[in-house]
Design a protein with these regions (language model features):
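A short helix->loop->beta-strand "cap" motif at the edges of active sites that frequently abuts
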Residues: 464-467
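A general structural detector for well-ordered alpha-helical segments in enzyme core domains, enriched
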Residues: 158, 454-458, 485-489
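Cell-envelope and extracellular/periplasmic
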Residues: 440-445
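Extracellular/periplasmic envelope-modification machinery, especially enzymes
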Residues: 189, 295, 307-437, 448, ...
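Short amphipathic alpha-helical segments
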Residues: 107-108, 116, 400-403, 452-453
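Hydrophobic membrane-embedded alpha-helices
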Residues: 2-315, 320, 324-349
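Residues at alpha-helix caps and immediate loop-helix transition turns in enzyme cores, especially N-
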Residues: 220, 251, 451-454, 481-485, ...
Length: 552
Protein backbone atom coordinates (compact mmCIF):
# COMPACT_ATOMS: atom_id res chain seq x y z
CA UNK A 1 0.00 0.00 0.00
CA UNK A 2 2.75 2.46 0.91
CA UNK A 3 5.08 1.83 -2.01
CA UNK A 4 2.44 1.58 -4.74
CA UNK A 5 0.67 4.73 -3.57
CA UNK A 6 3.91 6.68 -3.21
CA UNK A 7 4.99 5.71 -6.74
CA UNK A 8 1.61 6.72 -8.16
CA UNK A 9 1.89 10.08 -6.39
CA UNK A 10 5.38 10.52 -7.87
CA UNK A 11 4.06 9.70 -11.35
CA UNK A 12 1.28 12.25 -11.05
CA UNK A 13 3.73 14.84 -9.75
CA UNK A 14 5.91 14.34 -12.85
CA UNK A 15 3.24 13.96 -15.55
CA UNK A 16 0.03 15.31 -14.01
CA UNK A 17 -1.53 12.01 -15.09
CA UNK A 18 -1.54 8.27 -14.32
CA UNK A 19 -0.93 5.66 -17.03
CA UNK A 20 -3.25 2.91 -15.80
CA UNK A 21 -2.29 0.42 -18.51
CA UNK A 22 1.42 0.78 -17.70
CA UNK A 23 0.63 0.37 -14.01
CA UNK A 24 -1.17 -2.92 -14.60
CA UNK A 25 1.57 -4.08 -16.98
CA UNK A 26 4.26 -3.47 -14.35
CA UNK A 27 2.23 -5.31 -11.74
CA UNK A 28 1.69 -8.24 -14.12
CA UNK A 29 5.39 -8.72 -14.89
CA UNK A 30 6.30 -8.40 -11.21
CA UNK A 31 3.63 -10.71 -9.81
CA UNK A 32 2.65 -13.37 -12.36
CA UNK A 33 5.97 -14.90 -13.59
CA UNK A 34 7.31 -15.63 -10.07
CA UNK A 35 4.14 -17.41 -8.96
CA UNK A 36 4.16 -19.56 -12.09
CA UNK A 37 7.84 -20.40 -11.50
CA UNK A 38 7.10 -21.24 -7.87
CA UNK A 39 4.36 -23.72 -8.80
CA UNK A 40 6.46 -25.37 -11.53
CA UNK A 41 9.49 -25.76 -9.27
CA UNK A 42 7.69 -27.05 -6.19
CA UNK A 43 5.36 -29.56 -7.86
CA UNK A 44 8.02 -32.29 -8.39
CA UNK A 45 8.89 -32.09 -4.69
CA UNK A 46 5.35 -33.21 -3.84
CA UNK A 47 6.32 -36.70 -4.98
CA UNK A 48 8.41 -36.95 -1.80
CA UNK A 49 5.45 -36.71 0.60
CA UNK A 50 2.18 -38.55 1.11
CA UNK A 51 -0.70 -37.91 -1.28
CA UNK A 52 -2.65 -35.90 1.30
CA UNK A 53 -0.63 -32.88 0.17
CA UNK A 54 -1.57 -33.18 -3.50
CA UNK A 55 -5.26 -33.94 -3.00
CA UNK A 56 -7.19 -31.48 -5.21
CA UNK A 57 -3.88 -29.76 -5.99
CA UNK A 58 -5.22 -28.70 -9.39
CA UNK A 59 -7.88 -26.56 -7.74
CA UNK A 60 -5.28 -24.98 -5.50
CA UNK A 61 -3.14 -24.10 -8.52
CA UNK A 62 -6.09 -22.58 -10.38
CA UNK A 63 -6.98 -20.55 -7.29
CA UNK A 64 -3.37 -19.35 -6.95
CA UNK A 65 -3.04 -18.40 -10.63
CA UNK A 66 -6.43 -16.68 -10.53
CA UNK A 67 -5.49 -14.82 -7.33
CA UNK A 68 -8.55 -16.21 -5.58
CA UNK A 69 -6.90 -18.43 -2.96
CA UNK A 70 -8.45 -16.45 -0.12
CA UNK A 71 -11.99 -17.02 -1.38
CA UNK A 72 -11.21 -20.64 -2.24
CA UNK A 73 -10.12 -21.26 1.35
CA UNK A 74 -13.24 -19.53 2.68
CA UNK A 75 -15.59 -21.58 0.51
CA UNK A 76 -14.05 -24.92 1.51
CA UNK A 77 -14.08 -23.93 5.18
CA UNK A 78 -10.31 -24.04 5.54
CA UNK A 79 -8.33 -22.99 8.58
CA UNK A 80 -5.04 -21.09 8.23
CA UNK A 81 -3.58 -23.00 11.18
CA UNK A 82 -4.51 -26.44 9.81
CA UNK A 83 -1.49 -28.39 11.02
CA UNK A 84 -2.41 -31.78 9.54
CA UNK A 85 -2.53 -31.30 5.76
CA UNK A 86 -1.88 -27.61 5.06
CA UNK A 87 -2.39 -26.61 1.43
CA UNK A 88 0.90 -26.06 -0.37
CA UNK A 89 -0.26 -22.78 -1.89
CA UNK A 90 -2.28 -21.54 1.06
CA UNK A 91 0.11 -18.64 1.56
CA UNK A 92 -1.01 -17.07 -1.74
CA UNK A 93 -4.21 -15.97 0.01
CA UNK A 94 -2.45 -12.73 1.00
CA UNK A 95 -1.18 -12.26 -2.55
CA UNK A 96 -4.78 -12.57 -3.73
CA UNK A 97 -5.86 -9.79 -1.37
CA UNK A 98 -2.90 -7.72 -2.57
CA UNK A 99 -3.86 -8.15 -6.24
CA UNK A 100 -7.47 -7.22 -5.46
CA UNK A 101 -6.11 -4.07 -3.83
CA UNK A 102 -3.94 -3.25 -6.86
CA UNK A 103 -6.88 -3.51 -9.23
CA UNK A 104 -9.32 -1.49 -7.16
CA UNK A 105 -6.82 1.08 -5.89
CA UNK A 106 -5.16 1.52 -9.27
CA UNK A 107 -8.50 2.30 -10.92
CA UNK A 108 -9.55 4.64 -8.10
CA UNK A 109 -6.27 6.59 -8.13
CA UNK A 110 -6.42 6.77 -11.93
CA UNK A 111 -9.97 8.17 -11.65
CA UNK A 112 -8.77 10.77 -9.16
CA UNK A 113 -5.97 11.73 -11.54
CA UNK A 114 -8.60 12.51 -14.20
CA UNK A 115 -9.97 15.27 -11.94
CA UNK A 116 -7.00 17.47 -12.99
CA UNK A 117 -6.06 18.35 -9.42
CA UNK A 118 -2.88 20.04 -8.32
CA UNK A 119 -0.21 17.74 -6.90
CA UNK A 120 -1.03 18.86 -3.36
CA UNK A 121 -4.76 18.39 -3.82
CA UNK A 122 -4.20 15.03 -5.52
CA UNK A 123 -2.22 13.88 -2.48
CA UNK A 124 -5.00 15.16 -0.23
CA UNK A 125 -7.67 13.33 -2.23
CA UNK A 126 -5.73 10.09 -1.91
CA UNK A 127 -5.38 10.69 1.83
CA UNK A 128 -9.15 11.12 2.23
CA UNK A 129 -9.96 8.11 0.04
CA UNK A 130 -7.46 5.82 1.77
CA UNK A 131 -8.63 6.98 5.21
CA UNK A 132 -12.25 6.21 4.36
CA UNK A 133 -11.36 2.79 2.95
CA UNK A 134 -9.12 2.01 5.92
CA UNK A 135 -11.86 2.65 8.47
CA UNK A 136 -14.46 0.89 6.32
CA UNK A 137 -12.34 -2.26 6.06
CA UNK A 138 -11.40 -2.18 9.73
CA UNK A 139 -15.06 -1.76 10.66
CA UNK A 140 -15.94 -4.85 8.61
CA UNK A 141 -13.34 -6.89 10.51
CA UNK A 142 -14.37 -5.42 13.86
CA UNK A 143 -18.10 -6.09 13.44
CA UNK A 144 -17.59 -9.49 11.79
CA UNK A 145 -15.60 -10.69 14.78
CA UNK A 146 -18.87 -10.63 16.75
CA UNK A 147 -20.98 -12.22 14.02
CA UNK A 148 -19.00 -15.07 12.44
CA UNK A 149 -18.27 -18.37 14.16
CA UNK A 150 -15.58 -19.38 11.68
CA UNK A 151 -12.77 -16.82 11.82
CA UNK A 152 -11.58 -17.93 8.38
CA UNK A 153 -13.88 -15.37 6.74
CA UNK A 154 -12.44 -12.52 8.75
CA UNK A 155 -8.90 -13.72 8.15
CA UNK A 156 -9.08 -14.48 4.43
CA UNK A 157 -11.73 -12.04 3.15
CA UNK A 158 -10.69 -9.18 0.89
CA UNK A 159 -13.34 -6.99 2.48
CA UNK A 160 -12.06 -7.41 6.02
CA UNK A 161 -8.33 -7.90 5.51
CA UNK A 162 -7.39 -5.28 2.93
CA UNK A 163 -7.52 -2.30 5.30
CA UNK A 164 -3.77 -2.52 6.15
CA UNK A 165 -2.98 -1.60 2.53
CA UNK A 166 -4.95 1.60 2.90
CA UNK A 167 -3.15 2.45 6.13
CA UNK A 168 0.07 2.11 4.13
CA UNK A 169 -1.44 4.43 1.52
CA UNK A 170 -2.20 6.98 4.24
CA UNK A 171 1.43 6.94 5.34
CA UNK A 172 2.50 7.30 1.70
CA UNK A 173 0.60 10.59 1.50
CA UNK A 174 2.33 11.69 4.71
CA UNK A 175 5.83 10.97 3.42
CA UNK A 176 6.48 9.59 -0.08
CA UNK A 177 9.40 8.29 -2.10
CA UNK A 178 10.66 10.97 -4.51
CA UNK A 179 8.01 13.64 -3.92
CA UNK A 180 7.82 14.05 -0.15
CA UNK A 181 5.78 16.40 2.03
CA UNK A 182 7.06 19.48 3.85
CA UNK A 183 6.09 17.93 7.17
CA UNK A 184 8.15 14.85 6.41
CA UNK A 185 11.19 16.93 5.42
CA UNK A 186 10.93 18.89 8.67
CA UNK A 187 10.71 15.69 10.67
CA UNK A 188 13.85 14.36 8.99
CA UNK A 189 15.70 17.56 9.93
CA UNK A 190 14.38 17.78 13.48
CA UNK A 191 14.47 14.13 14.49
CA UNK A 192 17.71 12.76 15.83
CA UNK A 193 19.13 9.52 14.52
CA UNK A 194 18.44 7.98 17.92
CA UNK A 195 14.74 8.90 17.75
CA UNK A 196 14.37 7.40 14.27
CA UNK A 197 16.06 4.18 15.32
CA UNK A 198 14.02 4.05 18.52
CA UNK A 199 10.78 4.32 16.53
CA UNK A 200 11.89 1.57 14.17
CA UNK A 201 13.18 -0.84 16.82
CA UNK A 202 10.36 -0.08 19.25
CA UNK A 203 7.69 -0.68 16.64
CA UNK A 204 9.39 -3.91 15.61
CA UNK A 205 9.49 -5.08 19.24
CA UNK A 206 5.80 -4.33 19.68
CA UNK A 207 5.05 -6.20 16.46
CA UNK A 208 6.91 -9.24 17.80
CA UNK A 209 5.05 -8.98 21.08
CA UNK A 210 1.72 -9.13 19.26
CA UNK A 211 2.88 -12.29 17.53
CA UNK A 212 3.44 -13.96 20.89
CA UNK A 213 0.32 -12.82 22.74
CA UNK A 214 -2.33 -13.03 19.99
CA UNK A 215 -3.73 -16.19 18.43
CA UNK A 216 -5.32 -16.94 15.08
CA UNK A 217 -8.76 -17.66 16.53
CA UNK A 218 -8.68 -15.09 19.34
CA UNK A 219 -11.30 -12.35 19.08
CA UNK A 220 -8.85 -9.67 20.24
CA UNK A 221 -6.72 -10.47 17.20
CA UNK A 222 -9.50 -9.26 14.92
CA UNK A 223 -10.80 -6.47 17.13
CA UNK A 224 -7.44 -4.77 17.64
CA UNK A 225 -4.53 -7.08 16.77
CA UNK A 226 -4.37 -6.65 13.01
CA UNK A 227 -4.96 -2.91 13.25
CA UNK A 228 -2.13 -2.52 15.77
CA UNK A 229 0.18 -4.75 13.73
CA UNK A 230 -0.52 -2.63 10.65
CA UNK A 231 0.14 0.56 12.61
CA UNK A 232 3.47 -0.70 13.97
CA UNK A 233 4.51 -1.82 10.46
CA UNK A 234 3.69 1.62 9.07
CA UNK A 235 5.67 3.30 11.84
CA UNK A 236 8.63 1.12 10.86
CA UNK A 237 8.20 2.11 7.20
CA UNK A 238 8.04 5.80 8.10
CA UNK A 239 11.15 5.50 10.28
CA UNK A 240 13.05 3.61 7.56
CA UNK A 241 12.07 6.25 5.02
CA UNK A 242 13.26 9.01 7.37
CA UNK A 243 16.51 7.13 8.01
CA UNK A 244 17.17 7.03 4.25
CA UNK A 245 17.01 10.83 4.01
CA UNK A 246 18.80 11.33 7.32
CA UNK A 247 21.87 9.47 6.05
CA UNK A 248 22.09 10.37 2.34
CA UNK A 249 25.80 9.55 2.13
CA UNK A 250 25.38 6.04 3.54
CA UNK A 251 24.69 3.34 0.99
CA UNK A 252 22.33 0.50 1.74
CA UNK A 253 24.25 -2.71 2.56
CA UNK A 254 24.47 -5.07 -0.41
CA UNK A 255 22.97 -7.89 1.64
CA UNK A 256 19.92 -5.77 2.42
CA UNK A 257 19.53 -4.84 -1.25
CA UNK A 258 19.83 -8.48 -2.29
CA UNK A 259 17.15 -9.75 0.07
CA UNK A 260 14.98 -6.76 -0.71
CA UNK A 261 15.10 -7.68 -4.39
CA UNK A 262 14.17 -11.32 -3.84
CA UNK A 263 11.81 -10.93 -0.86
CA UNK A 264 8.72 -11.58 -2.98
CA UNK A 265 10.25 -14.76 -4.36
CA UNK A 266 11.23 -15.97 -0.89
CA UNK A 267 7.67 -15.36 0.25
CA UNK A 268 6.39 -17.52 -2.61
CA UNK A 269 8.86 -20.40 -2.25
CA UNK A 270 9.25 -20.69 1.51
CA UNK A 271 5.83 -22.08 2.39
CA UNK A 272 5.58 -25.10 0.04
CA UNK A 273 9.24 -25.96 0.62
CA UNK A 274 8.86 -25.87 4.39
CA UNK A 275 5.62 -27.89 4.36
CA UNK A 276 7.28 -30.59 2.25
CA UNK A 277 10.65 -30.70 4.03
CA UNK A 278 9.08 -30.65 7.51
CA UNK A 279 7.49 -33.99 6.64
CA UNK A 280 10.86 -35.50 5.78
CA UNK A 281 13.31 -34.20 8.39
CA UNK A 282 13.71 -32.35 11.67
CA UNK A 283 12.36 -28.83 11.99
CA UNK A 284 15.74 -27.07 12.07
CA UNK A 285 17.02 -28.93 9.03
CA UNK A 286 13.76 -28.31 7.16
CA UNK A 287 14.03 -24.60 8.00
CA UNK A 288 17.65 -24.43 6.82
CA UNK A 289 16.94 -26.23 3.56
CA UNK A 290 13.87 -24.07 2.99
CA UNK A 291 15.92 -20.90 3.44
CA UNK A 292 18.69 -22.05 1.10
CA UNK A 293 16.44 -23.27 -1.71
CA UNK A 294 13.99 -20.37 -1.38
CA UNK A 295 16.84 -17.88 -1.64
CA UNK A 296 18.40 -19.68 -4.62
CA UNK A 297 15.19 -20.03 -6.64
CA UNK A 298 14.01 -16.53 -5.73
CA UNK A 299 17.32 -15.06 -6.95
CA UNK A 300 17.16 -17.11 -10.16
CA UNK A 301 13.62 -15.90 -10.74
CA UNK A 302 14.27 -12.21 -10.03
CA UNK A 303 17.67 -11.72 -11.63
CA UNK A 304 17.43 -14.09 -14.61
CA UNK A 305 14.03 -15.47 -15.58
CA UNK A 306 11.80 -12.46 -14.92
CA UNK A 307 13.99 -10.05 -16.99
CA UNK A 308 14.03 -12.61 -19.82
CA UNK A 309 10.23 -12.77 -19.83
CA UNK A 310 9.96 -8.97 -19.77
CA UNK A 311 12.46 -8.66 -22.63
CA UNK A 312 15.10 -7.00 -20.48
CA UNK A 313 18.77 -7.72 -19.93
CA UNK A 314 19.35 -9.80 -16.78
CA UNK A 315 21.34 -7.99 -14.08
CA UNK A 316 22.31 -8.88 -10.55
CA UNK A 317 23.04 -5.96 -8.22
CA UNK A 318 24.01 -3.86 -11.24
CA UNK A 319 26.20 -6.54 -12.83
CA UNK A 320 25.11 -7.69 -16.30
CA UNK A 321 24.52 -11.42 -16.69
CA UNK A 322 25.04 -13.22 -19.99
CA UNK A 323 22.39 -15.95 -19.96
CA UNK A 324 22.08 -16.41 -23.73
CA UNK A 325 23.76 -19.86 -23.68
CA UNK A 326 21.33 -20.96 -20.96
CA UNK A 327 18.07 -19.81 -22.56
CA UNK A 328 17.34 -23.12 -24.27
CA UNK A 329 18.02 -25.02 -21.05
CA UNK A 330 15.76 -22.70 -19.07
CA UNK A 331 12.92 -22.95 -21.59
CA UNK A 332 13.34 -26.72 -21.84
CA UNK A 333 13.35 -27.12 -18.07
CA UNK A 334 10.21 -25.01 -17.80
CA UNK A 335 8.50 -27.25 -20.35
CA UNK A 336 9.48 -30.42 -18.50
CA UNK A 337 8.32 -28.97 -15.18
CA UNK A 338 5.02 -27.94 -16.77
CA UNK A 339 4.41 -31.48 -18.02
CA UNK A 340 5.28 -32.94 -14.60
CA UNK A 341 2.94 -30.46 -12.91
CA UNK A 342 0.08 -31.34 -15.26
CA UNK A 343 0.57 -35.08 -14.72
CA UNK A 344 0.61 -34.69 -10.94
CA UNK A 345 -2.46 -32.42 -11.02
CA UNK A 346 -4.54 -34.79 -13.16
CA UNK A 347 -3.41 -37.87 -11.24
CA UNK A 348 -3.97 -36.32 -7.81
CA UNK A 349 -6.89 -37.72 -5.79
CA UNK A 350 -9.78 -35.50 -4.77
CA UNK A 351 -9.36 -36.68 -1.19
CA UNK A 352 -6.10 -37.69 0.45
CA UNK A 353 -5.71 -40.78 2.60
CA UNK A 354 -6.15 -38.80 5.80
CA UNK A 355 -9.35 -37.04 4.65
CA UNK A 356 -10.77 -40.29 3.30
CA UNK A 357 -10.01 -42.03 6.58
CA UNK A 358 -11.62 -39.21 8.56
CA UNK A 359 -14.74 -39.41 6.39
CA UNK A 360 -15.05 -43.16 6.93
CA UNK A 361 -14.37 -42.82 10.66
CA UNK A 362 -17.01 -40.08 10.94
CA UNK A 363 -19.61 -42.31 9.30
CA UNK A 364 -18.62 -45.20 11.55
CA UNK A 365 -18.87 -42.96 14.61
CA UNK A 366 -22.32 -41.77 13.55
CA UNK A 367 -23.50 -45.34 12.99
CA UNK A 368 -22.14 -46.49 16.35
CA UNK A 369 -23.74 -43.56 18.13
CA UNK A 370 -27.10 -44.30 16.51
CA UNK A 371 -26.96 -47.95 17.56
CA UNK A 372 -26.14 -47.00 21.15
CA UNK A 373 -28.99 -44.50 21.18
CA UNK A 374 -31.42 -47.11 19.91
CA UNK A 375 -30.22 -49.59 22.55
CA UNK A 376 -30.72 -47.06 25.33
CA UNK A 377 -34.17 -46.22 24.03
CA UNK A 378 -35.03 -49.93 24.04
CA UNK A 379 -34.03 -50.08 27.70
CA UNK A 380 -31.04 -52.42 27.36
CA UNK A 381 -29.28 -51.98 30.68
CA UNK A 382 -26.09 -53.58 29.41
CA UNK A 383 -25.80 -50.93 26.72
CA UNK A 384 -25.78 -48.07 29.18
CA UNK A 385 -22.71 -45.97 28.54
CA UNK A 386 -20.51 -45.21 31.50
CA UNK A 387 -17.76 -43.62 29.38
CA UNK A 388 -17.87 -40.59 27.08
CA UNK A 389 -14.76 -39.90 24.98
CA UNK A 390 -14.59 -36.34 23.64
CA UNK A 391 -11.75 -36.31 21.15
CA UNK A 392 -10.12 -34.75 18.13
CA UNK A 393 -9.04 -36.30 14.84
CA UNK A 394 -6.64 -38.72 16.57
CA UNK A 395 -9.55 -40.22 18.49
CA UNK A 396 -11.63 -40.18 15.32
CA UNK A 397 -8.87 -42.06 13.53
CA UNK A 398 -9.12 -44.75 16.23
CA UNK A 399 -12.89 -45.20 15.88
CA UNK A 400 -12.78 -48.83 14.68
CA UNK A 401 -10.47 -49.88 17.49
CA UNK A 402 -12.64 -48.13 20.08
CA UNK A 403 -15.66 -49.98 18.70
CA UNK A 404 -13.97 -53.36 19.04
CA UNK A 405 -12.22 -52.83 22.39
CA UNK A 406 -14.71 -50.50 24.10
CA UNK A 407 -18.07 -51.20 22.43
CA UNK A 408 -20.11 -49.50 25.15
CA UNK A 409 -18.12 -46.26 25.12
CA UNK A 410 -19.69 -43.28 23.39
CA UNK A 411 -17.20 -41.55 21.06
CA UNK A 412 -17.68 -37.90 20.12
CA UNK A 413 -14.68 -36.90 18.01
CA UNK A 414 -14.15 -34.38 15.23
CA UNK A 415 -11.31 -32.89 13.20
CA UNK A 416 -9.38 -29.90 14.58
CA UNK A 417 -11.35 -29.91 17.83
CA UNK A 418 -10.06 -27.44 20.39
CA UNK A 419 -10.59 -27.32 24.15
CA UNK A 420 -13.37 -24.75 23.70
CA UNK A 421 -15.18 -26.87 21.11
CA UNK A 422 -14.83 -29.92 23.36
CA UNK A 423 -16.22 -27.94 26.29
CA UNK A 424 -19.38 -27.16 24.33
CA UNK A 425 -20.04 -30.90 23.93
CA UNK A 426 -19.14 -31.52 27.57
CA UNK A 427 -21.40 -28.72 28.88
CA UNK A 428 -24.31 -29.86 26.72
CA UNK A 429 -24.18 -33.26 28.42
CA UNK A 430 -23.84 -31.67 31.85
CA UNK A 431 -26.85 -29.41 31.31
CA UNK A 432 -28.93 -32.30 29.95
CA UNK A 433 -27.92 -34.51 32.89
CA UNK A 434 -26.67 -37.14 30.43
CA UNK A 435 -22.99 -37.04 31.35
CA UNK A 436 -21.56 -40.56 31.87
CA UNK A 437 -19.71 -41.40 35.05
CA UNK A 438 -16.31 -41.20 33.32
CA UNK A 439 -15.41 -38.49 30.80
CA UNK A 440 -12.31 -38.86 28.66
CA UNK A 441 -10.94 -35.57 27.29
CA UNK A 442 -8.73 -36.45 24.31
CA UNK A 443 -7.94 -33.00 22.90
CA UNK A 444 -5.12 -30.46 23.21
CA UNK A 445 -3.15 -30.60 19.97
CA UNK A 446 -5.26 -27.87 18.36
CA UNK A 447 -5.20 -25.39 21.25
CA UNK A 448 -1.99 -25.62 23.28
CA UNK A 449 -1.66 -21.94 24.18
CA UNK A 450 -4.22 -21.34 26.97
CA UNK A 451 -4.41 -24.90 28.20
CA UNK A 452 -4.48 -24.09 31.94
CA UNK A 453 -7.71 -22.08 31.82
CA UNK A 454 -9.15 -24.30 29.10
CA UNK A 455 -8.73 -27.46 31.19
CA UNK A 456 -9.78 -25.77 34.42
CA UNK A 457 -13.24 -25.07 33.03
CA UNK A 458 -13.81 -28.83 32.71
CA UNK A 459 -12.78 -29.42 36.32
CA UNK A 460 -15.04 -26.62 37.55
CA UNK A 461 -18.08 -27.83 35.59
CA UNK A 462 -17.63 -31.56 36.28
CA UNK A 463 -20.53 -32.64 38.52
CA UNK A 464 -20.01 -34.59 41.73
CA UNK A 465 -19.91 -38.34 41.27
CA UNK A 466 -17.98 -38.16 38.01
CA UNK A 467 -14.38 -38.79 36.96
CA UNK A 468 -12.23 -37.06 34.36
CA UNK A 469 -9.53 -38.74 32.26
CA UNK A 470 -7.11 -36.37 30.50
CA UNK A 471 -5.31 -37.72 27.43
CA UNK A 472 -1.95 -36.00 27.03
CA UNK A 473 -1.60 -34.63 23.47
CA UNK A 474 1.28 -35.40 21.14
CA UNK A 475 2.65 -33.44 18.19
CA UNK A 476 6.18 -34.16 17.01
CA UNK A 477 6.43 -30.66 15.51
CA UNK A 478 5.42 -28.91 18.77
CA UNK A 479 7.12 -31.07 21.36
CA UNK A 480 7.83 -28.25 23.81
CA UNK A 481 4.21 -27.12 23.92
CA UNK A 482 2.88 -30.65 24.16
CA UNK A 483 5.28 -31.44 26.99
CA UNK A 484 4.05 -28.40 28.90
CA UNK A 485 0.42 -29.50 28.54
CA UNK A 486 1.37 -33.00 29.70
CA UNK A 487 3.20 -31.73 32.78
CA UNK A 488 0.21 -29.61 33.74
CA UNK A 489 -2.22 -32.51 33.33
CA UNK A 490 0.00 -34.81 35.40
CA UNK A 491 0.05 -32.19 38.15
CA UNK A 492 -3.74 -31.97 38.06
CA UNK A 493 -3.95 -35.74 38.50
CA UNK A 494 -1.72 -35.51 41.58
CA UNK A 495 -3.81 -32.71 43.08
CA UNK A 496 -7.24 -34.21 42.32
CA UNK A 497 -8.21 -37.83 42.99
CA UNK A 498 -10.99 -37.71 40.40
CA UNK A 499 -8.53 -36.80 37.62
CA UNK A 500 -6.52 -39.52 35.84
CA UNK A 501 -4.03 -39.14 33.01
CA UNK A 502 -3.90 -41.34 29.91
CA UNK A 503 -0.32 -40.61 28.90
CA UNK A 504 -0.55 -40.81 25.11
CA UNK A 505 2.39 -38.39 24.87
CA UNK A 506 4.70 -40.90 26.56
CA UNK A 507 3.29 -43.82 24.60
CA UNK A 508 3.91 -41.92 21.37
CA UNK A 509 7.48 -41.18 22.44
CA UNK A 510 8.09 -44.82 23.31
CA UNK A 511 6.88 -46.06 19.91
CA UNK A 512 8.64 -44.04 17.16
CA UNK A 513 7.86 -46.71 14.57
CA UNK A 514 4.21 -45.62 14.37
CA UNK A 515 5.14 -42.16 13.02
CA UNK A 516 6.89 -43.04 9.77
CA UNK A 517 5.61 -40.91 6.88
CA UNK A 518 3.07 -39.04 9.03
CA UNK A 519 2.48 -35.47 10.14
CA UNK A 520 3.66 -36.28 13.66
CA UNK A 521 0.14 -36.05 15.09
CA UNK A 522 -1.73 -38.91 13.44
CA UNK A 523 -0.07 -42.30 13.69
CA UNK A 524 0.35 -44.38 10.54
CA UNK A 525 -2.65 -46.61 9.92
CA UNK A 526 -0.33 -49.36 8.74
CA UNK A 527 1.04 -49.73 12.29
CA UNK A 528 -0.45 -50.66 15.65
CA UNK A 529 -0.88 -46.99 16.54
CA UNK A 530 -4.64 -47.31 17.04
CA UNK A 531 -4.21 -50.24 19.42
CA UNK A 532 -1.64 -48.31 21.45
CA UNK A 533 -3.83 -45.20 21.58
CA UNK A 534 -6.98 -47.04 22.67
CA UNK A 535 -5.10 -49.25 25.13
CA UNK A 536 -3.55 -46.18 26.77
CA UNK A 537 -7.00 -44.70 27.29
CA UNK A 538 -8.50 -48.03 28.37
CA UNK A 539 -5.80 -48.51 31.02
CA UNK A 540 -6.41 -45.00 32.35
CA UNK A 541 -10.17 -45.62 32.57
CA UNK A 542 -9.51 -48.81 34.51
CA UNK A 543 -7.22 -46.91 36.86
CA UNK A 544 -9.78 -44.11 37.27
CA UNK A 545 -12.49 -46.58 38.28
CA UNK A 546 -10.42 -47.50 41.34
CA UNK A 547 -10.16 -43.87 42.46
CA UNK A 548 -12.69 -41.61 44.12
CA UNK A 549 -15.11 -39.65 41.99
CA UNK A 550 -15.48 -35.90 42.43
CA UNK A 551 -17.12 -35.01 45.72
CA UNK A 552 -16.49 -38.41 47.30
Amino acid sequence: GFLITALLIDEYHRKQSIDLLSFFKRRFYRIVPPIVIMVLVTMPFTLLVRNDFIASIGRQIVAAFGFMTNWYEIFIGSNYENQFNPHLFLHTWSLAVEVHFYIFWGILVWWLSRRKLTSVNFRGAIFLASTALFFSGYLVMFISSFLVKNVSFNYFSTFSHSFPFYLGAIYATMSGVADTTKRFKKNVQRWSLRRILFQFVGSFALLLLLGFVLSYDGQLTYLFGFALASLFACLMIYAARALHDKLPAVDEPVVVTFFSDISYGIYLFHWPFYIIFSQLMSNWLASLLTFVLSTAFAALSFYVIEPMIAGKEPKMLGIKLNVTPCKKWIIGSAGILAVISLIISFAAPKLGEFESGVLVDSLTQADTGMNLTNQRTAGDANAQNNVLIIGDSVALRSQDTFSSKMPNALIDASVSRSFDAAYETFKTNVDANTLPETVVLAVGVNSPDNYQSDIQQFLDALPDGHRLVLVTPYDAQEDTKMSAVRDYELQLAQDNDYVTVADWYQTAKDNPDIWGGTDGVHYSQSTNGADLYVQTIQDAISQASKKSAKGQ
